[in-house]
Amino acid sequence: MALTLTDVKRIAHLARLEMADADAEHMLGQLNELFGLVEQMQAVDTAGIAPLAHPIEQIQEVAQRLREDAVTEVVNRDDNQRPAPAVQDGLYLVPKVIE
């Protein structure tokens, strides 16, 4: 799927970004290259291939370098919300920014 210049300008508008025509054309090229790469990856037949956490697992045994998931500190919501300008029912209140 290739984007058009109109698509890039619409996306910029929705993101509330000002973008000059030259920048939009440059971004169009970059996005289309990215989408081309994604299409190439999607075209690869991966049926029957087990997902890997580390591709090197195919060559050698890899020990997971992940730590045990354990609680190391207790978060006190009241202490964290005390400096906030507005809090209600444990939630931070912020001004409306999008209509």
Curated annotation (Swiss-Prot):
<comment type="similarity">
    <text>Belongs to the GatC family.</text>
</comment>
<dbReference type="GO" id="GO:0050566">
    <property type="term" value="F:asparaginyl-tRNA synthase (glutamine-hydrolyzing) activity"/>
</dbReference>
<dbReference type="GO" id="GO:0005524">
    <property type="term" value="F:ATP binding"/>
</dbReference>
<keyword id="KW-0067">ATP-binding</keyword>
<comment type="subunit">
    <text>Heterotrimer of A, B and C subunits.</text>
</comment>
<dbReference type="Pfam" id="PF02686">
    <property type="entry name" value="GatC"/>
</dbReference>
<keyword id="KW-0648">Protein biosynthesis</keyword>
<dbReference type="InterPro" id="IPR036113">
    <property type="entry name" value="Asp/Glu-ADT_sf_sub_c"/>
</dbReference>
<comment type="function">
    <text>Allows the formation of correctly charged Asn-tRNA(Asn) or Gln-tRNA(Gln) through the transamidation of misacylated Asp-tRNA(Asn) or Glu-tRNA(Gln) in organisms which lack either or both of asparaginyl-tRNA or glutaminyl-tRNA synthetases. The reaction takes place in the presence of glutamine and ATP through an activated phospho-Asp-tRNA(Asn) or phospho-Glu-tRNA(Gln).</text>
</comment>
<dbReference type="GO" id="GO:0006450">
    <property type="term" value="P:regulation of translational fidelity"/>
</dbReference>
<dbReference type="GO" id="GO:0070681">
    <property type="term" value="P:glutaminyl-tRNAGln biosynthesis via transamidation"/>
</dbReference>
<dbReference type="GO" id="GO:0050567">
    <property type="term" value="F:glutaminyl-tRNA synthase (glutamine-hydrolyzing) activity"/>
</dbReference>
<dbReference type="InterPro" id="IPR003837">
    <property type="entry name" value="GatC"/>
</dbReference>
<keyword id="KW-0436">Ligase</keyword>
<keyword id="KW-0547">Nucleotide-binding</keyword>
<dbReference type="GO" id="GO:0006412">
    <property type="term" value="P:translation"/>
</dbReference>
<protein>
    <recommendedName>
        <fullName>Aspartyl/glutamyl-tRNA(Asn/Gln) amidotransferase subunit C</fullName>
        <ecNumber>6.3.5.-</ecNumber>
    </recommendedName>
</protein>
